[in-house]
Structures are given as C-alpha cells and as structure tokens.
A protein has these predicted regions:
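Intrinsically disordered, low-complexity N-terminal extensions of AAA+/P-loop NTPases
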Residues: 1-187
Length: 187
C-alpha cells in the first residue's frame, strides 16, 4: 500500500538532494571504498540507504528489484574510479561562498591549506546530508583513527592532518575544531 505521506517525504528528500556537492560525493565514495564503509552500506539484499545509492549514481537495476551485492560492489568501484579521474582532470572546489569564508579565516587566523581543507570538510559534513550519513558508516573512531580517516578522505598526508588538529594548531586554538582525544566518536 502506497503511503502518500512517505511518498511526499521521498519527493522532498529527492528534491533536497538533487545537487550533491561534487566534493561531498567524492569524499563519500572514498569513505565507502577506501575506508570500508561499503560493508555497512551494501547489504546482501539492498543498500542501507536507497536514496544515497541513487544520488551516488548506482544503476536503476540495482535500485530496483534486481539488487545484487556483488554487482553493487563492482559499480561502487567504478563510481569511485570515475570520481577520482574527474577530480584529477577537473578538480572540484568548494562553493564560492565557502571558499571566500575559508580564505577570510585563513588570513585572519593564519590557517594553512590543510587546515582550510579540514575546516571545509567539516562544513560539508554538517551541510550535506549524504556525506554526513555516509560518514556514520565508519562507526565510532578514536582521535588517531579520525585523523587517519581524514588523511585518506582528503587525500593529504597523515602528518599534515595530525599537525593541523594538534592542540597547539590554529584550528584548536581558535576553537573552530576540537578533536577530543579521550574517547571515541563519530567522524
């Protein structure tokens, strides 16, 4: 039985997610492929979040009645590979507004490029539902694992991320980002 309320909610969600930021999509694919988030995302019989699969670009066959987890993993690998190729050929950037604000903060606080990238990532996690939901597939992470995950997601050296998130770093001192080292948390 079709529930009109659920259909309206799905239509609203589809409308809201029609324009997923290219960086959010790339980073979501890295989480799924390079960090193992796919184990939670691709189940034996379906995707854990059908709407995410749709917006990442999975085929209609997998989104419908013909789901096959093996084919889903193959498509995921292809989607990830294509996103990486596109990123090399035509690098995605933050929106003009976010770029402007990051540049202002960079000048005011003396942030380096990696610190700006981490801050931009945090903004996208909080503003892009797709990226936020995919990041949850990593489960709880210690501070060290969070830094390793960020290095992989952002494709920057681990040591640069560690320095950017250090207690003596600009992000921590400014209060913009505080990585709690005492316990595990979601990314």
């Amino acid at each position: 039985m079709n529930n009109p309320f659920m259909q309206n909610m799905q239509q609203e969600e589809d409308r809201y997610l029609t324009d997923v930021h290219p960086l959010a999509k790339l980073w979501a694919l890295r989480i799924l492929v390079e960090l193992g988030g796919a184990k939670e995302f691709i189940n034996d019989n379906c995707f854990s979040h059908q709407w995410i699969a749709k917006h990442l670009g999975f085929s209609e066959a997998l989104l419908g009645e013909q789901f096959n987890s093996q084919i889903a993993y193959q498509e995921l690998a292809q989607l990830h590979q294509m996103a990486e190729i596109v990123q090399v050929q035509n690098p995605a950037q933050f929106s003009a507004e976010l770029s402007y604000n990051l540049k202002l903060l960079q000048r005011l606080l003396g942030l380096n490029e990696v610190e700006c990238l981490i801050l931009g990532f945090v903004v996208l996690v909080h503003s892009e539902q797709l990226l936020d939901d995919i990041a949850d597939h990593l489960g709880t992470l210690t501070a060290a694992k969070s830094m390793k995950a960020l290095a992989i997601i952002l494709a920057v050296p681990y040591e640069d991320v560690r320095q950017a998130l250090a207690v003596q770093g600009c992000l921590h001192r400014s209060g913009l980002i505080h990585l709690q080292r005492e316990y595990s948390s979601y990314l």
